[in-house]
A protein has these predicted regions:
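Extreme N-terminal starter segment of soluble prokaryotic enzymes
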Residues: 1-6
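Short polar catalytic/cofactor-binding loops
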Residues: 8-14
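Cys-nucleophile CN-hydrolase/nitrilase-fold catalytic domain and related Cys-dependent amidase chemistry
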Residues: 16, 28-110
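Short amphipathic alpha-helical segment that frequently serves as the phosphate-/nucleotide-binding helix
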Residues: 17-24
């Protein structure tokens, strides 16, 4: 049987690096309690695009939403080049853990 830990934390909104650092602290904590598989919520990194619902849905020509989406996309993790993804791999290997969690991914910049 695998021991699962589900981490429920608030992100450092639209800051992927700070959210990962916060999450990493919790990962080390749950590992010390015997976790083998660690999961976390949808789009934790860099945060859920909460501006969609209160603003009446996705309005892509709205200047405020364009600005918010630009920041959201900027904070997405480029899967092949992300230092955060590399650190996730390092942490998982070091602590002999499996991760299954929500991130916003982006294609390679190259």
């Amino acid at each position: 049987m695998i021991r699962l830990a589900c981490i429920q934390i608030a992100p450092v909104f639209l800051d992927a690096k700070k959210t990962w650092e916060k999450l990493k602290e919790k990962i080390v904590e749950v590992k010390s309690n015997g976790a083998e598989l660690v999961t976390w919520g949808e789009t934790l990194i860099p945060g859920y695009p909460q501006w969609i619902s209160p603003s009446g849905g996705a309005k892509f020509n709205n200047p405020q939403q364009k600005k918010a989406y630009a920041k959201y996309w900027q904070e997405a993790l480029h899967l092949e080049e992300s230092k955060i993804i590399e650190d996730m791999k390092t942490v998982a290997k070091k602590h002999k853990l499996m991760f299954m969690g929500g991130i916003i991914g982006a294609p390679s910049k190259n």
